[in-house]
UniProtKB/Swiss-Prot annotation:
Cited Gene3D superfamilies: 1.20.120.1750, 2.20.25.20, Zinc/RING finger domain, C3HC4 (zinc finger)
Assembly and binders: Interacts with (neddylated) CUL5; promoting association with cullin-5-RING ubiquitin ligase complexes (ECS complexes). Does not interact with other neddylated cullins (CUL1, CUL2, CUL3, CUL4A or CUL4B). Interacts (via RING-type zinc finger 1) with UBE2L3. Interacts (via RING-type zinc finger 2) with UBE2N. Interacts (via RING-type 2) with GFI1B. Interacts with GFI1; prevents its ubiquitination and proteasomal degradation.
Organism annotation: Homo sapiens
Regulation acting on activity, per entry: Autoinhibited by the ariadne domain, which masks the second RING-type zinc finger that contains the active site and inhibits the E3 activity. Inhibition is relieved upon binding to neddylated cullin-RING ubiquitin ligase complexes, which activate the E3 ligase activity of ARIH1.
GO biological process, one term: protein ubiquitination
Gene Ontology MF term list: ubiquitin conjugating enzyme binding; ubiquitin protein ligase activity; ubiquitin-protein transferase activity; zinc ion binding
UniProt region (Disordered), positions on chain: 1-38
The protein's name in its UniProt record: E3 ubiquitin-protein ligase ARIH2
Processing and modification events after translation: Ubiquitinated. Ubiquitination promotes proteasomal degradation.
Gene: ARIH2
Superkingdom of this protein's organism: Eukaryota
Tissue: Widely expressed with higher expression in granulocytes.
Modification type Phosphoserine: residues: 353
């Protein structure tokens, strides 16, 4: 199958956030170029039997609308308020403090109910409580004489006038604070229940903001819930067991890690990927690598631009086959062990000067970063290839050269390629921070095997007319099994 290398992928549109919407809006049509689409519709196209059917990324989750999430939260709150004999607002503060783990709350309540309320910051700690030292009927903020009925306080009895409370709450809500609105007294930890704050907000606009911030804080504190990070998306993801696993919103199709809400990053764990991304953003030395799109052919020295995702390059002038990453001859590149992904440590570096160690550290970082960035660029180029395949299939169907079913395997191959390369990209931060030893050697071996099969698949996808369907689907199966094996052995978070 030949494809036009100049066409571009389309952009996806995102819907506005509307927490008051009663019904879910219809899902938008999938954009074939989106990274979020990598995992869709692939599993059914690669036959799995026995142990091969095990998917290390399998993870049960549910997508909830705003109303469904609110209903689930209110159900917990109503039940707990009834058992603890507290107001609904206080019950919510207790739930937030204990991450909505009701069984733990009830156990603590049975053992020491007073301490539970202190820990939830709804009652003062008797041993540390400092009563107000201001004259009676005086506001402790503006120091004005105030009628008793205009003085308001929480359980700590720190009294302030209604005007100061209104100003305090309004400023905090404008700054995006929800559950965090607290007593104005210095060093007083007590939080204000929502039924205390709402009457103090002067207009409906602020009250609506406060509702949204409360909902955000309630969801973020719940150990089984995460807000979808998609732009203006109101959906909430619910799981039974919180883990660093891939979830996807069924409204905006955003794919992310449930635990950290960042882009899905298996096999790298959440803390490591944060460290890696911070390092990439901070290190100015990477700028030259980010902008590098061309290299010289190692045989005839003609300048070559990479316009596809495959790292198996063929010079258009001399027809020399070489690796884009290391410029090695492709014929001997992966004959026994795919060396291109493995960094060779200098065993004597600990005995050398600090300057030499710094140079070695930079060399190591650039080695991994260049490969990380190269696969990122390959993903973007292969997304364009996917779009062109999609358009080519449409053209063939319109010309009665087969049905969608006949050509669907080409799209599935491009999707699986992106899925595998996406995993491969995130193996490089994992390897960069990994301690040397037998486990790292095993990881590098599996990483190399995966990379070799991905490049074989990429080569065949970009030259689909030269390979029959069985050959392509066999390569898909091999690449996916390499990917699953690596994740099964190393994605243990």
């Amino acid at each position: 199958m030949s494809v036009d290398m100049n066409s571009q992928g389309s952009d996806s549109n995102e819907e506005d956030y509307d927490p008051n919407c009663e019904e879910e809006e219809e899902e938008e049509e999938d954009d074939p170029g989106d990274i979020e689409d990598y995992y869709v519709g692939v599993a059914s196209d690669v036959e799995q039997q026995g142990a091969d059917a095990f998917d290390p990324e399998e993870y049960q989750f549910t997508c909830l609308t705003y109303k469904e999430s609110e209903g689930a939260l209110n159900e917990h709150m109503t039940s707990l308020a009834s058992v603890l004999k507290v107001s609904h607002s206080v019950a919510k503060l207790i739930l937030v403090n204990f991450h909505w783990q009701v069984s733990e709350i009830l156990d603590r309540y049975k053992s020491n109910s007073a301490q539970l309320l202190v820990e939830a910051r709804v009652q003062p700690n008797p041993s540390k409580h400092v009563p107000t030292s201001h004259p009676p009927h005086h506001c402790a903020v503006c120091m004005q004489f105030v009628r008793k009925e205009n003085l308001l306080s929480l359980a700590c009895q720190h009294q302030f006038c209604r005007s100061c409370w209104e100003q305090h709450c309004s400023v905090l809500v404008k700054d995006g604070v929800g559950v965090g609105v607290s007593c104005m007294a210095q060093d007083c930890p007590l939080r204000t229940p929502e039924d205390f704050v709402f009457p103090l907000l002067p207009n409906e606009e602020l009250r609506e903001k406060y509702r949204r911030y409360l909902f955000r804080d309630y969801v973020e504190s719940h150990y089984q819930l995460q807000l979808c990070p998609g732009a203006d998306c109101p959906m909430v993801i619910r799981v039974q067991e919180p883990r660093a696993r891939r979830v996807q919103c069924n409204r905006c199709n955003e794919v992310f890690c449930f635990k950290c809400r960042q882009m899905y990053h298996a096999p790298t764990d959440c803390a490591t990927i944060r460290k890696w991304l911070t390092k990439c953003a901070d290190d100015s030395e990477t700028a030259n690598y980010i902008s590098a799109h061309t290299k010289d052919c190692p045989k005839c020295n003609i300048c070559i631009e990479k316009n596809g995702g495959c790292n198996h390059m063929q010079c258009s002038k001399c027809k020399h086959d070489f690796c884009w990453m290391c410029l090695g001859d492709w014929k001997t590149h992966g004959s026994e062990y795919y060396e291109c992904s493995r960094y060779k440590e200098n065993p004597d570096i600990v005995n050398q000067s600090q300057q030499a160690q710094a140079r070695e550290a930079l060399k190591k970082y650039l080695f991994y970063f260049e490969r990380w960035e190269n696969h990122n660029k390959s993903l973007q180029l292969e997304a364009q290839t996917y779009q062109r395949i999609h358009e080519k299939i449409q053209e063939r169907v319109m010309n009665n050269l087969g049905t969608w079913i006949d050509w669907q395997y080409l799209q599935n191959a491009a999707k699986l390629l992106a899925k595998c390369r996406y995993t491969l990209q995130y193996t490089y931060p994992y390897a960069y921070y990994m301690e040397s030893g037998p486990r790292k050697k095993l990881f590098e071996y599996q990483q190399a095997q995966l990379e070799a099969e991905i490049e074989n698949l990429s080569w065949k996808v970009e030259r689909a007319d030269s390979y029959d369907r069985g050959d392509l689907e066999n390569q898909m199966h091999i690449a996916e099994q390499r990917r699953r094996t690596l994740l099964k052995d190393f994605h243990d978070t």
